[in-house]
Amino acid sequence: MGNHKAALTKQVFTFASELYAYGVREVVISPGSRSTPLALAFEAHPNIKTWIHPDERSAAFFAVGLIKGSERPVAILCTSGTAAANYTPAIAESQISRIPLIVLTSDRPHELRSVGAPQAINQVNMFNNYVSYEFDMPIADDSKETINAIYYQMQIASQYLYGPHKGPIHFNLPFRDPLTPDLNATELLTSEMKILPHYQKSIDASALRHILNKKKGLIIVGDMQHQEVDQILTYSTIYDLPILADPLSHLRKFDHPNVICTYDLLFRSGLDLNVDFVIRVGKPVISKKLNQWLKKTDAFQILVQNNDKIDVFPIAPDISYEISANDFFRSLMEDTTINRVSWLEKWQCLEKKGRKEIKCYLEQATDESAFVGELIKKTSEKDALFISNSMPIRDVDNLLLNKNIDVYANRGANGIDGIVSTALGMAVHKRITLLIGDLSFYHDMNGLLMSKLNNIQMNIVLLNNDGGGIFSYLPQKESATDYFERLFGTPTGLDFEYTAKLYQFDFKRFNSVSEFKNATLLSETSTIYELITNREDNFKQHQILYQKLSEMIHDTL
């Protein structure tokens, strides 16, 4: 028994130390019995912060938010059985978004697998469709090889925690009873750092000269790291190229004449220009209309992503580069320039007139977009916005026009689950205001527990149209009229004031845009600001804006 405890202690303390060595500073633990050894090891480590969340699904999304906020890998730990399966949505989001989430599932020892033991399911390779690397660790024993396996496996897995190969990894860890390590053996807990991998590549720019020397070019930038924007702006300035900047690109923070923000509304309202080449940077953009245009255009398309697995949506490019945006554009700098002034001025004219139409619209609108416009005005440069999927991110795409605020969202799998938890994870490291719809909020209300337990401050702006507003913009609205409200509108009639009381949030309800205009978003407390809207009215008012922009485009071109 003594040998077992010593072996278990050395294994889990070594494992915790190795995670620290590769940059882990936070672990989110969901309580359970089988995870006892590692939970105690993390709790005992002097330089690892532990978070406790009883719901595995929300815990995993909370960790995703921690990673977004800290830009470091974060580990999650749960007990054996179906607890692990609840991690799946967040792992899928992490895989598509290249988020270094370290998944640690505790397991029954091998002799208790597939024999009917309680809380024992097949956990080996259970996430293999969504993780970059996985390994079923050996059980603790006295052999040197068991400890060496930790060193070897962490070294292999570390390539997926940094650089272009980033993504979630999974370690399944079986533990045999008794489960308590020796908490006095703290000398085994170390805080040494490994040399982390560094990735940088250059390109042969000569292969692109004949393409980039053409006049009508665009730079389209999706979700990407804020550290990569400098060279994009420099290249755009030198070569007179418009930048169509997604709200998650971090480029709308800059008051730069080449940054185009109204493109979604312009394409939605009938814009269709001939283009020679497109440089696509980062993840796919949010705008459905821009993605549809990319699918049909004859322009030569260059894709730049700092990933080992290129996301080609909405269409495969003519050529792609696995390289950072800064390195790519730095490689293209040359002495000669192309005169594209008239091409750039055409886009700048459309942008200026588009902004004017949006401003006039917002001065009179009473729908959700008017609420979103007011929220953007109220958000200070010290704060960041986390935007839920569905309609909120689309309204922000249309209405965020060059303001120095950071915008974040879960745009990997684009799901509505785990939004509250992800935003709260980010709120640990940044001042965050969450913009979310009522169905997305309902889906992750239990995520609010982390705010209550840990005093994490975050304001929530809740757009409540009592259902799924985005479906009003889809063909189902007209083709399935008799069934639409039951199958797609899905009203719930929930009173979210009770949710606020349950999780000790302040609560304010606004029934009109004029009421919200006079409100102050407090930074000292956690408050839910509920904005009551109407789905049908939202749809009708959006159509008015599209028509105004369509007329503007017709008069301009």
From Swiss-Prot:
Catalytic activity reported: isochorismate + 2-oxoglutarate + H(+) = 5-enolpyruvoyl-6-hydroxy-2-succinyl-cyclohex-3-ene-1-carboxylate + CO2
Keyword terms: Magnesium, Manganese, Menaquinone biosynthesis, Metal-binding, Thiamine pyrophosphate, Transferase
Cofactor binding summary note: Binds 1 thiamine pyrophosphate per subunit.
Keyword match Iron: no
Cited Gene3D superfamilies: 3.40.50.970, TPP-binding domain
Role according to the record: Catalyzes the thiamine diphosphate-dependent decarboxylation of 2-oxoglutarate and the subsequent addition of the resulting succinic semialdehyde-thiamine pyrophosphate anion to isochorismate to yield 2-succinyl-5-enolpyruvyl-6-hydroxy-3-cyclohexene-1-carboxylate (SEPHCHC).
Subunit (UniProt): Homodimer.
Family named by the database record: Belongs to the TPP enzyme family. MenD subfamily.
The protein's name in its UniProt record: 2-succinyl-5-enolpyruvyl-6-hydroxy-3-cyclohexene-1-carboxylate synthase
Gene: menD
